[in-house]
Amino acid sequence: VSIHKIRSGETLIVEGPARIVVDEGELTLIGAPIRQGDTIIVKKSRHVAVEGTTDSALKISLGASGHVDLLNTSTIPLEWKELAETLNKLTIPFRAVFFGDIDTGKTTFVTYLANIFYQWGKRTGVVSTDLGQGFPGLITLYQLETPIVDMAEITPTDAFFVGSTTPDCFENRVMIGTELMIKKAESVGIEALFVDTTGWVYGFKARELKKSLIELIQPDVLVVVERERELEHLIRPFLNSTKVLRMPVSPKIRYRNRTDRKFLRESMLSKQLSGSDTITFHFKEVSFFNSFLNTGEIVSGTLNEKISEIVEYVPKYVEVCSDVILIAEDHETPLSENIIEKFQEEFPHLPIQIISAEIIENVLVGLIDIQNTFLGYGVITNIDFLKQLITIYTPVSKEQISSIQFGSLKVTPDGRELCWIHPWSF
C-alpha cells in the first residue's frame, strides 16, 4: 500500500488491478463525488481518473500490472462541462444521443453527464446500446439512484437480450431493444435520458443503423464525439433536422486493444454466471426465440418414414415448420446434393436445414419471464433431441423462466468466449 497525495485540480490516473481508499479530502470520479473512507476497486484492463476537489490523500494497492500517473490538469474537457450547462437549458424530459468511434470515451462522457444531472436533482437515466461493453449482448437501461462510478458494476434497471457483441446482423434486435428501454425510461419518469451507442460507425450497414436510431429516438440533441470530423458521413444528413453538437475526445483517453475488450467481456460473463446450477426443460415447457427449433410439429408416422427414406437413415429428430424442415443429430451430418435434390422434389416449397447438438451446445442465451423481462444469462450445456430436453447452466431459478432467447455467441460455463455463430443457425 502506498500513499498518494493529490492537490485540488490535479488528476490521478490509476490503471488496474488496484484498490483505492480515500484517506482524506474530497475528489470526483467521472463527475461522481468520492470522500474520505470511500473505496474504489479498479479491475484489470480498466482505469479510473480521480480528480482532486480539495487537497487529498489516497491509499492505493496495485496489482501486478497496475500503475499510477499524476496529471496537473483535469481529464474532463472544458467542452464537456459546458455541454452539461447547455443541456440543462433544455425542456425536460429530453433525450441526448451520443455517436462516436471506438475509443473516443463516449461511455465516460455519458457517465459524467449522468452524474452531473443526477446531482442537479434531475431524474436521470442511461440507455446503453453498446453490445460489446458492459453487459455483453445486452441493451441496458440504468436509472440513477446514486452517482455512477462504473456502469458495468451496477445492476441495470432493465435489459433486452440481443445475444451478440456486435450489432452487425442484429440491427432489428438493436432497434427493438432500444425502443423498449426508452419506453421503460419514460414509464418511470426519466427527465434526462442519455443514449450511448456502439462504436460501429463505418460502412452502409452502420450508416443505416445510426439513421434508424435517430429516427426512432428523435433526440433533442445529437452529441458527436470525434477527433477530426471523422463522423461527418453519419451526421451531415441530420444537420438540417436535428440539433448536432460536436464534442472533442478527451486527450487522456486510454485505448483498449481487442484482448482487453475480450477480457472485460469474459470477466463480466464469469461474474454473471457465478453461483449457477444446471436446469433442464422439456421442449414443451418453454418457448424458444431466435431459433427454428420447437416452432413446428415433430414428425412421426408416414411422413417420418418418407423423410428417412430420402436421407437413407432414421434421424433422431425431425420437425416440420411452415417455412423449413429441421433434421437434428448429435453431430453435424451434411447431406449430399442427390439427397437435397430428392427433398426439393418431395417438398418443393420447404427448405431443409440440418442442425446438431454440437452447434447448440455452449450457446449463450437470455432467460425471460412471462412478462418478457430479462432475468439473466444462461449457457446451453446439453440438448437431447430424442427426449426433447434442453439443459442450461444459469443462476436463474427454473420457476421464473418462460422462454429462452438464443444468442450467436458461444461461451464456456465460466464465460470464456469460444466462437460466433450465424443467427438462425438452428
Residue ranges and their predicted role:
Residues 106:
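Conserved lysine of the Walker
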Residues 113-119:
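Walker A/P-loop NTP-binding motif
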Residues 138-142, 199, 210, 341, ...:
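Conserved mixed alpha/beta catalytic, RNA-binding, or beta-rich assembly cores of soluble enzyme
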Residues 75-93, 97-99, 121-195, 200-201:
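Nucleotide-state-sensitive switch-loop elements of NTP-binding domains
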Residues 1-94, 98, 112, 165, ...:
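Preference for solvent-exposed, low-hydrophobicity sequence contexts
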Residues 102:
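The conserved Walker
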